[in-house]
Amino acid sequence: MELRAFCVILLITFLAVSSQAAKNKKEKGKKGASDCTEWTWGRCIPNSKDCGAGTREGTCKEETRKLKCKIPCNWKKAFGADCKYKFENWGECNATTGQKVRSGTLKKALYNADCQQTVEATKPCSLKTKSKSKGKKGKGKE
């Protein structure tokens, strides 16, 4: 009888301690809630080179926070990594400049970034013209 009572007390103690530990862990995961609503975020600064993982600093009143961010390595540096644009198809090749042009309209500005409403992108004209395939290649009946 004493062994049974001891086991029950031990089990209850174990459950109480583990539930308290879980509660403390949950509270530790929550960061201090801020009453700030008007955050001003800076641009994403990469940790090395000009793309990849980095940090972004934000301020609100006297509070400062840093967030992890990522700059894609194929971004157009002239437009900024926080400005997302919807681009049209490439235009015809301009023989005098040797370039194609397309324009884009602002789709989304992340972190209140200062973005241009419309932008233009250029690329050199390709030297060869691509021929369209004349049919499916592969196995099959002719």
Swiss-Prot record:
GO cellular component terms listed in the entry, alphabetical order: extracellular region
Example GO molecular function: heparan sulfate proteoglycan binding
SMART domains (UniProt xref): PTN
Disulfide bonds: 36-60, 44-69, 51-73, 83-115, 93-125
Keyword Isomerase: no
PROSITE patterns registered for this protein in UniProt: PTN_MK_1, PTN_MK_2
Keyword annotations from UniProtKB, A to Z: Antibiotic, Antimicrobial, Developmental protein, Differentiation, Disulfide bond, Growth factor, Heparin-binding, Mitogen, Secreted, Signal
SUPFAM superfamilies in the cross-refs: Midkine (SSF57288)
Localization, UniProt: Secreted
One GO-annotated biological process of the protein: neuromuscular junction development
Signal peptide location: 1-21
Xref: InterPro entries: Midkine_heparin-bd_GF (IPR000762), PTN/MK_C_dom (IPR020090), PTN/MK_C_dom_sf (IPR038130), PTN/MK_diS_sf (IPR020091), PTN/MK_N_dom (IPR020089), PTN/MK_N_dom_sf (IPR037122), PTN_MK_heparin-bd_GF_CS (IPR020092)
Protein family per UniProt: Belongs to the pleiotrophin family.
PANTHER family: MIDKINE (PTHR13850:SF2), PLEIOTROPHIN FAMILY MEMBER (PTHR13850)
Biological function: Secreted protein that functions as a cytokine and growth factor and mediates its signal through cell-surface proteoglycan and non-proteoglycan receptors. Binds cell-surface proteoglycan receptors via their chondroitin sulfate (CS) groups. Thereby regulates many processes like inflammatory response, cell proliferation, cell adhesion, cell growth, cell survival, tissue regeneration, cell differentiation and cell migration. Inhibits mesoderm formation and promotes neural formation during development. Plays a role in development of the neuromuscular junction (NMJ).
Name by which UniProt lists this protein: Midkine
